[in-house]
């Protein structure tokens, strides 16, 4: 109904930002609200809750490096996006704007501040992202996936609520699938993913690790791996040579179901991936993406590693030999895999969308 309150959801155009926004959108629609997504052009390729007529694209730019021309261009682009978002907000009259991180959230959340519309941000990482850090003093409320993210900042901790990471219906369905450890000498299902954009490091390391496994394990292995198009031929050649049952693809649209159907996952440790591993309860070997200013992926992986739900391997230590050793050890210990799955599940939270929706409704004054 056009008369029902509208809530704008703002997110960067990658899965880690979009999927929690989609999960909140599902819950808000269930409660009778209207929702629209404000994002960048990358989001148009994602299927899911948001059809194209529910998406508003505003210009944004990631501020990279210290080149003064790049910084100036990013600033001008974000300013133009803010003006566009302000016009959008005045036209649509939302009761709240909720941001999920990424530079495309800056224009709508800054515009909301100027327009007097309540703003809320959600951050799924163990440390606040750069865009959310900038917005943190400009919004009414902050929601985090993990406890303690802002405990050391008294100016922000008072308006911070820990809610967890909102999960899409597909993840909730996968979370209902119990973990069944591989039987001795039975099939071992291994899933290798590298994040929403794929990861060359997996193509460089994993085939060599599989080669180093005992031949008896080759016959047990059922491998599913995310591989970029440019790496496909060389990766497939290794698995064909070893006669490994392998499904390779640049992207999997049904990743939650695949997480649920595998015995072990090798992955980067983006916030969304870690949250889904915890919600579904699957053991993993996590390789944090290095080089980020805040080392957010290292901290994310630590959430599961600290409870023995995952093995965290820094990229400097991520070699074919090391990975082969870890896979071999886990394959020989089904009970350990079961314990890891239970530990990961214990770190998950399935009611985050409801909790975040409660916060949004409260901040909007409804």
Swiss-Prot record:
* Cellular compartment(s): Cell inner membrane
Q: Provide the reaction this enzyme catalyses.
A: di-trans,octa-cis-undecaprenyl diphospho-N-acetyl-alpha-D-muramoyl-L-alanyl-D-glutamyl-meso-2,6-diaminopimeloyl-D-alanyl-D-alanine + UDP-N-acetyl-alpha-D-glucosamine = di-trans,octa-cis-undecaprenyl diphospho-[N-acetyl-alpha-D-glucosaminyl-(1->4)]-N-acetyl-alpha-D-muramoyl-L-alanyl-D-glutamyl-meso-2,6-diaminopimeloyl-D-alanyl-D-alanine + UDP + H(+)
Q: Which residues bind UDP-N-acetyl-alpha-D-glucosamine?
A: 14-16, 125, 168, 196, 297
Provide GO CC annotations from the record: plasma membrane
Predominant location: membrane
Query: Transmembrane region positions?
Result: none
This protein's membrane topology, according to the annotation, is: Peripheral membrane protein
One example of a Gene Ontology biological process annotation: cell division
Presence of keyword Endoplasmic reticulum: no
Matching Gene3D superfamilies, A to Z? Glycogen Phosphorylase B
Q: List the GO molecular function terms.
A: UDP-N-acetyl-D-glucosamine:N-acetylmuramoyl-L-alanyl-D-glutamyl-meso-2,6-diaminopimelyl-D-alanyl-D-alanine-diphosphoundecaprenol 4-beta-N-acetylglucosaminlytransferase activity; undecaprenyldiphospho-muramoylpentapeptide beta-N-acetylglucosaminyltransferase activity
Report the pathway entry.
Cell wall biogenesis; peptidoglycan biosynthesis
Query: Which UniProt keyword terms apply here?
Result: Cell cycle, Cell division, Cell inner membrane, Cell membrane, Cell shape, Cell wall biogenesis/degradation, Glycosyltransferase, Membrane, Peptidoglycan synthesis, Transferase
Which E.C. number(s) belong to this protein?
A: 2.4.1.227
Entry's family note: Belongs to the glycosyltransferase 28 family. MurG subfamily.
Described purpose of this protein according to its UniProt entry: Cell wall formation. Catalyzes the transfer of a GlcNAc subunit on undecaprenyl-pyrophosphoryl-MurNAc-pentapeptide (lipid intermediate I) to form undecaprenyl-pyrophosphoryl-MurNAc-(pentapeptide)GlcNAc (lipid intermediate II).
- Protein name, please? UDP-N-acetylglucosamine--N-acetylmuramyl-(pentapeptide) pyrophosphoryl-undecaprenol N-acetylglucosamine transferase
Q: Which organism is it from?
A: Bradyrhizobium diazoefficiens (strain JCM 10833 / BCRC 13528 / IAM 13628 / NBRC 14792 / USDA 110)
| Higher taxonomy | Bacteria, Pseudomonadati, Pseudomonadota, Alphaproteobacteria, Hyphomicrobiales
* Chain's gene name: murG
């Amino acid at each position: 109904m056009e008369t029902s309150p509208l809530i704008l959801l703002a997110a960067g155009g990658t899965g880690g930002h979009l999927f929690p926004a989609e999960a909140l959108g599902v819950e808000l629609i269930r409660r009778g609200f209207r929702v629209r997504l404000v994002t960048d052009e990358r989001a148009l390729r994602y299927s899911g809750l948001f059809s194209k007529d529910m998406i508003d694209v505003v210009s944004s730019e990631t501020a990279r490096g210290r080149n003064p021309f790049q910084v100036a261009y990013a600033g001008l682009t974000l300013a133009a996006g803010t003006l566009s978002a302000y016009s959008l907000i005045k036209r649509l009259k939302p009761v709240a704007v909720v941001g999920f991180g990424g530079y495309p959230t800056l224009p709508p959340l800054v515009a909301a501040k100027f327009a007097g519309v309540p703003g809320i941000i959600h951050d799924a990482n163990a440390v606040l992202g750069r865009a959310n850090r900038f917005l943190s003093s400009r919004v009414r409320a902050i929601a985090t996936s993990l406890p303690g993210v802002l405990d050391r900042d008294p100016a922000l901790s008072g308006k911070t609520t820990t809610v967890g990471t909102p999960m899409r219906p597909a993840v909730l369905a996968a979370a209902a699938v119990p973990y069944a450890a591989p039987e001795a000498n039975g099939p071992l299902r291994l899933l290798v993913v590298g994040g929403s954009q794929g990861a060359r490091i997996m193509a460089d390391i994993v085939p060599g690790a599989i080669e180093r496994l005992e031949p008896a394990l080759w016959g047990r292995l059922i491998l599913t791996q995310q591989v970029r198009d440019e790496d496909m031929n060389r990766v497939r050649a290794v698995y064909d040579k070893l006669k490994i049952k392998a499904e390779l693809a640049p992207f999997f649209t049904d990743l939650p179901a695949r997480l649920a159907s595998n015995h072990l996952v090798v992955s980067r440790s983006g916030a969304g991936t870690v949250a889904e591993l915890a919600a579904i309860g699957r053991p993993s070997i996590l390789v944090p993406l290095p080089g980020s200013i805040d080392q957010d992926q290292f901290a994310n992986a630590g959430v599961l590693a600290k409870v023995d739900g995952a093995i965290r391997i820094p990229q400097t230590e991520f070699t074919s030999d090391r990975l082969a050793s870890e896979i071999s050890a886990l394959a020989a210990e089904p009970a350990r895999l079961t314990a890891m799955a239970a530990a990961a599940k214990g770190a998950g939270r399935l009611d985050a969308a409801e909790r975040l929706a409660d916060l949004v409704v409260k901040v909007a004054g409804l």
